[in-house]
């Protein structure tokens, strides 16, 4: 038997008290852990300290929130990152200036950084000095906060290059009654799949709004999974991860659910609303737009075969007519499926 070093945390800091961050606070307190949430949104902080979830009309008990980042960093040695991708690097730079001892990080945000094409794990390693970075893991999978807050059965995957740490995160977040966590060593694949599925959800929202049938949606999912696999391979991840919870599982949830911000944003695109207007009017971040831009630029730079990404970019960012983009995509040369 392998003797493992104890990494279990009884105090956890969550940075970002939005829908998912606050919901994960409930998961952790259900497991008898102590949680401190951080947010710059003072109304969120006030609601949480009143025992209310800041987004949903549900109680959030035994959780405290503050607006002082230094206080939250001093609270525990485990930091859960639950902020949108566009704020990630800036946040990590602020954290680095305040760290005095090594911390472990768990990322629950999904996306790729534009321009750099970096995953969250890569940004963390780039920004946080090695002596101050104890461990890193991602926690991903099909998990609408709207259902988890009601304690409906959900499965997630904790991925880390450190198998001991992924096991500890599995134990920390698993609730016997409603949340089960698997482990994975494919951190790369989990991050890519979790980001890519938001793009397919955007496009599926467009298809549904334009009254395309389930046959068309199934075709989008199938060919989209193939492109997801190509990207995972490009990033040197395990293509098998595409069939796991952060891949196929999260894709189903995001592309077909009424709760999905990306799916609903796609429907608005179909109605002729510009993507920037959708972003500006959304109370919660629609990660699919930024991720689409990042993967499109990556495709151009490395000459990758990602026709759905290319068509989606033309439709959303270049405002090309849907019929024109669709015709170009469907009239691609005939060839073998794989």
From Swiss-Prot:
BP GO terms, sorted: carbohydrate metabolic process; glycerol-3-phosphate biosynthetic process; glycerol-3-phosphate catabolic process; glycerophospholipid metabolic process; phospholipid biosynthetic process
User: Could you tell me one molecular function GO term of this UniProt entry?
Assistant: glycerol-3-phosphate dehydrogenase [NAD(P)+] activity
Q: Which domain of life is it from?
A: Bacteria
Q: Which NCBIfam families match?
A: PRK00094.1-2 (NF000940), PRK00094.1-4 (NF000942)
Binding residues for NADPH: 20, 110, 145, 261, 287
Pfam families recorded: NAD_Gly3P_dh_C, NAD_Gly3P_dh_N
Where is this chain primarily localised?
cytoplasm
Q: Which organism is it from?
A: Aster yellows witches'-broom phytoplasma (strain AYWB)
The record's family statement is: Belongs to the NAD-dependent glycerol-3-phosphate dehydrogenase family.
PROSITE patterns from the UniProt entry: NAD_G3PDH
Functionally, this protein is described as follows: Catalyzes the reduction of the glycolytic intermediate dihydroxyacetone phosphate (DHAP) to sn-glycerol 3-phosphate (G3P), the key precursor for phospholipid synthesis.
Name the residues that bind sn-glycerol 3-phosphate: 110, 141, 143, 197, 250, 260-262
Enzyme Commission number(s) from the entry: 1.1.1.94
Catalytic activity reads: sn-glycerol 3-phosphate + NAD(+) = dihydroxyacetone phosphate + NADH + H(+); sn-glycerol 3-phosphate + NADP(+) = dihydroxyacetone phosphate + NADPH + H(+)
What UniProt keywords apply to this chain's record, in alphabetical order? Answer: Cytoplasm, Lipid biosynthesis, Lipid metabolism, NAD, NADP, Nucleotide-binding, Oxidoreductase, Phospholipid biosynthesis, Phospholipid metabolism
Gene3D superfamilies for this protein: N-(1-d-carboxylethyl)-l-norvaline Dehydrogenase, domain 2, NAD(P)-binding Rossmann-like Domain
Alphabetical list of InterPro entries matching this protein = 6-PGluconate_DH-like_C_sf, 6PGD_dom2, G3P_DH_NAD-dep, G3P_DH_NAD-dep_C, G3P_DH_NAD-dep_N, NAD(P)-bd_dom_sf
Top enzyme class: oxidoreductase
State the active site: 197
Q: Which GO terms describe its cellular component?
A: cytosol
Keyword Nucleotide-binding assigned: yes
Q: Where in the cell is it found?
A: Cytoplasm
Q: Work out whether the entry's keyword set contains Oxidoreductase.
A: yes
Full protein name: Glycerol-3-phosphate dehydrogenase [NAD(P)+]
Q: In which pathway does it act?
A: Membrane lipid metabolism; glycerophospholipid metabolism
